[in-house]
């Protein structure tokens, strides 16, 4: 993608390099990268109420009140745990540098065939992120919510209210996203530039003094 402004984590090609990049693409000299996507289904009282395709993450989050919620999580129909937390993030490798990273989850290399479950502010210190292969199916049931509102969001764009007993099924989608990679930057260079990863931020004056 071409970055027309903003952080542009997925749009690796700056606007100044648009025409050279188009030339390389037409010549078949640009690498195409395939990214995992997720499918999320909400089941209420045995009936499917919505289905969404997700590139970055599925997030279950409590409302404005400072109360935790209980989420029963099953992996391939086997009980994993009950997360007592502010919420839960299910993230793809593409989305691992977004909300997942802010919540203490790891960065996943974007072409990995896996996804990650990351609790948001868990009540129990032993509740930590867990990495799963793409073949696994995750089932999350809202077992307790009290009076507060609990929201389910898809890629931070679409919101959906969850009620006690609702079940969210998440699995690998049949669809894949194909991205054209920048010929000038690798993934780790993008991490350093966009997220200031692996070191303290510096400005051009600091860089000039170091070179001098």
Language-model-detected regions and their locations in the chain:
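Flexible glycine-/small-residue-rich
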Residues: 3, 42, 75, 92, ...
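Gly/Ser-rich helix-loop-strand patches that form or flank binding pockets
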Residues: 1-9
């Amino acid at each position: 993608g071409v970055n027309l402004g903003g952080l542009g984590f997925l749009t690796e090609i700056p606007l100044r390099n648009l025409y050279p990049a188009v030339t390389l693409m037409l010549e078949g000299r640009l690498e195409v990268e395939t990214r995992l996507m997720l499918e999320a289904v909400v089941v209420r009282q045995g009936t499917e109420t919505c289905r969404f395709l997700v590139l970055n993450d599925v997030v279950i989050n409590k409302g404005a009140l400072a109360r935790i919620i209980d989420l029963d999580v099953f992996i391939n129909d086997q009980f994993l745990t009950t997360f007592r937390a502010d919420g839960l993030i299910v993230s793809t490798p593409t989305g691992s540098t977004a909300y997942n990273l802010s919540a203490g989850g790891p960065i996943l290399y974007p072409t990995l065939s896996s996804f990650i479950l990351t609790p948001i502010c868990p009540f129990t210190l032993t509740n930590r992120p867990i990495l799963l292969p793409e073949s696994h199916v995750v089932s999350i049931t809202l077992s307790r919510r009290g009076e507060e509102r609990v929201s389910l969001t898809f890629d931070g764009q679409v919101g959906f209210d969850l009620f006690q007993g609702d079940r969210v099924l998440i699995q690998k989608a049949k669809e894949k996203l194909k991205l054209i990679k920048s010929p000038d930057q690798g993934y780790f260079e993008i991490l350093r530039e966009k997220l200031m990863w692996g070191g303290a931020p510096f400005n051009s004056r600091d860089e000039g003094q170091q070179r001098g």
